[in-house]
Amino acid sequence: MQDTIFLKGMRFYGYHGALSAENEIGQIFKVDVTLKVDLAEAGRTDNVIDTVHYGEVFEEVKSIMEGKAVNLLEHLAERIANRINSQYNRVMETKVRITKENPPIPGHYDGVGIEIVRENK
């Protein structure tokens, strides 16, 4: 089964990071979420109750990203994946990618970040 729902390029301002400058100044974080979901029933019925409402998923991600500051992107991603997997039994797998586009690291790059994949058990 290859069906997915994705939320790409969500942007949130937060104060996450291991460096004190990140906690004081803050920065924009880009978040992508991909959910493995069987969409066949929703395709047949045209009813939102047969799928995962991506507006609700956005609000879940927003509450974590704009909430209490943490040190690691890995921790944020785990919280997002755990929240989605616990709230939506239709989701079989959650992939979360978080990017810092302008971290306080010298050099030239488009961004740094992490990506995790967690199965819904």
Curated annotation (Swiss-Prot):
It catalyses: 7,8-dihydroneopterin = 6-hydroxymethyl-7,8-dihydropterin + glycolaldehyde; 7,8-dihydroneopterin = 7,8-dihydromonapterin. One of its GO terms (molecular function) is isomerase activity. GO terms for cellular component: cytoplasm. The active site is at residue 100. InterPro entries: Dihydroneopterin_aldolase (IPR006156), FolB_dom (IPR006157), GTP-CH-I_C/QueF (IPR043133). Keywords: Folate biosynthesis, Isomerase, Lyase. GO terms for biological process: folic acid biosynthetic process; tetrahydrofolate biosynthetic process. The keyword Lyase applies. The keyword Plastid does not apply. Pathway: Cofactor biosynthesis; tetrahydrofolate biosynthesis; 2-amino-4-hydroxy-6-hydroxymethyl-7,8-dihydropteridine diphosphate from 7,8-dihydroneopterin triphosphate: step 3/4. Gene3D superfamilies: 3.30.1130.10. Its EC number is 4.1.2.25, 5.1.99.8. SUPFAM superfamilies: Tetrahydrobiopterin biosynthesis enzymes-like. Substrate binds at residues 22, 54, 73-74. NCBIfam families: folB (TIGR00525), folB_dom (TIGR00526). Homooctamer. Four molecules assemble into a ring, and two rings come together to give a cylinder with a hole of at least 13 a diameter. Catalyzes the conversion of 7,8-dihydroneopterin to 6-hydroxymethyl-7,8-dihydropterin. Can also catalyze the epimerization of carbon 2' of dihydroneopterin to dihydromonapterin. Belongs to the DHNA family. This is Dihydroneopterin aldolase. The lineage of its organism: Bacteria, Bacillati, Bacillota, Bacilli, Bacillales. The gene is folB.
